[in-house]
Amino acid sequence: MRKQVEIFTDGSCLGNPGPGGYGAILRYKQHERTFSAGYRLTTNNRMELMAAIVSLEALREHCIVTLSTDSQYVRQGITQWIHNWKKRGWKTAEKKPVKNVDLWQRLDAALSQHEIKWEWVKGHAGHPENERCDELARAAAMAPTLEDTGYQPEATAS
């Protein structure tokens, strides 16, 4: 019988782009583990993705996972966009490279190991675990120690 786990995630960015962080809670029965890290220059979407990735990659066996996020970007990316991106070789409908492809590919690989139920929660609406993840993410963003090597700044028109 597969273990049933709950994951709660949030990402934060002080400026977008700017210093950012993620926070996640992984819960199995009475056991809880938290994850957080801060990056010097990143985006809120990258931090939302990292929160889900890191917590899923921490699982050592196939699990039934309920993953809660307040990110529409993550939710829509997984439930609506990713299948077509993969079919098109990680290109958008406009034939442009998918933003944050490095993280979408990591998330896709992490998801393939588990049975996932996605839950969207409204951010900053009093959901206790989401609020804790937000606190972890903001604290990490305020004391960043890591480089987000996959972050690619937008090209600006000159």
Curated annotation (Swiss-Prot):
GO terms for cellular component: cytoplasm. CDD domains: RNase_HI_prokaryote_like. Its EC number is 3.1.26.4. Residues 1-142 form the RNase H type-1 domain. It is found in: Cytoplasm. Mg(2+) 1 binds at D10, E48, D70. Monomer. This is Ribonuclease H. It comes from Cronobacter sakazakii (strain ATCC BAA-894).
